[in-house]
């Protein structure tokens, strides 16, 4: 469950290391985002020479969340950290690699490129 001011790790190779959520997209009163939701975030920590710099405002999709997501069969999937992938406006990732596992819910929300680049889909 990501809300405004939540900090997340970055699960791609754009050069950003840490993001802070600025806005949850999808409605004016929406407070929380979960796996597969798009948020606007600020880059808080970045490596030198990367695609994005510290202070950049980017769109990203949540790929891992500490808050469990309920599956249709009744099971829950949760991760040890909150992580996001920086995306372009056409839902494609800005980076060329994805690090760590991602949830299967991304496939249902049409983030196919992220799912195909991920080393593991849980």
UniProtKB/Swiss-Prot annotation:
SUPFAM superfamilies: Ribosomal protein L14 (SSF50193)
Record key words, sorted: Ribonucleoprotein, Ribosomal protein, RNA-binding, rRNA-binding
Transmembrane segments: none
InterPro entries: Ribosomal_uL14, Ribosomal_uL14_bac-type, Ribosomal_uL14_sf
GO biological process: translation
Pfam families: Ribosomal_L14
Entry keyword Heme: no
Molecular-function GO terms, alphabetical: large ribosomal subunit rRNA binding; structural constituent of ribosome
UniProt keyword Ribosomal protein, yes or no: yes
GO cellular component: cytosolic large ribosomal subunit
Subunit: Part of the 50S ribosomal subunit. Forms a cluster with proteins L3 and L19. In the 70S ribosome, L14 and L19 interact and together make contacts with the 16S rRNA in bridges B5 and B8.
Similarity annotation: Belongs to the universal ribosomal protein uL14 family.
Name of protein: Large ribosomal subunit protein uL14
């Amino acid at each position: 469950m990501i809300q405004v001011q939540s900090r997340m790790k970055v699960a791609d190779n754009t050069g950003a290391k840490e993001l802070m959520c600025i806005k949850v997209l999808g409605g004016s009163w929406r407070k929380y985002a979960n796996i597969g939701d798009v948020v606007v975030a600020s880059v808080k920590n970045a490596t030198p020479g990367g695609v994005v710099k510290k202070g950049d405002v980017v769109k990203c999709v949540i790929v891992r969340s500490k808050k469990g997501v309920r599956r249709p069969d009744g099971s829950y999937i949760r991760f040890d950290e909150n992580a996001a992938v920086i995306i372009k406006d056409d839902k494609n990732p800005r980076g060329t690699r994805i690090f760590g596992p991602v949830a299967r819910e991304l496939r249902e929300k049409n983030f196919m490129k992220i799912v195909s680049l991920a080393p593991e889909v849980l």
